């Protein structure tokens, strides 16, 4: 965790796994019915990584789950209930095998992920230009 994070509802923020970094001045807003989960899968052949830049906003109910790699640029915002993952988490035909297809996710600077948005594997969202 970088310098000066703002965490509203600290007991509802769940960070689990290895290789997780969040830049300076991140804001996490949580609530009893909408926890924020930042999770990596580090087992078998997978060594998940999550890297978030500076000034990111994580709203209630946000989930970010990585089996490979999720890179989040500076000043990105995640609205209520957004879910970003780099994996399908299991195959269609053999659901007993963990993880399944997993490809890197990259969110460039100033990307906003809207309310209840869900995205899996190989997303690349380009920087939002305010001009």
Mark where each language-model region is:
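Domain-scale signature associated with acetyltransferase and cell-envelope carbohydrate enzymes
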Residues: 1-85, 105-110, 116-119
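Flexible, solvent-exposed loop segments that connect beta-strands
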Residues: 93-98
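Conserved small/polar residues in nucleotide/adenosyl-binding loops
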Residues: 121-128
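Gly/Pro- and small hydrophobic-enriched strand-loop and loop-to-helix capping segments
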Residues: 131
């Amino acid at each position: 965790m970088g310098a000066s994070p703002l965490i509203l509802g600290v007991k509802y923020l769940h960070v689990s796994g290895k290789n997780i970094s969040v830049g300076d001045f991140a804001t996490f807003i949580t609530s009893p019915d909408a926890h924020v989960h930042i999770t990596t899968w580090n087992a078998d052949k997978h060594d998940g990584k999550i890297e978030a830049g500076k000034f990111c906003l994580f709203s209630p109910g946000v989930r970010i789950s990585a089996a490979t790699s999720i890179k989040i640029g500076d000043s990105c915002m995640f609205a209520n209930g957004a879910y970003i993952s780099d994996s399908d988490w299991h195959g269609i035909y053999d659901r007993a095998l963990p993880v399944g297809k997993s490809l890197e996710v990259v969110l460039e600077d100033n990307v906003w992920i809207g309310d209840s948005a869900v995205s899996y594997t190989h997303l690349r969202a380009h920087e939002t230009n305010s001009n």
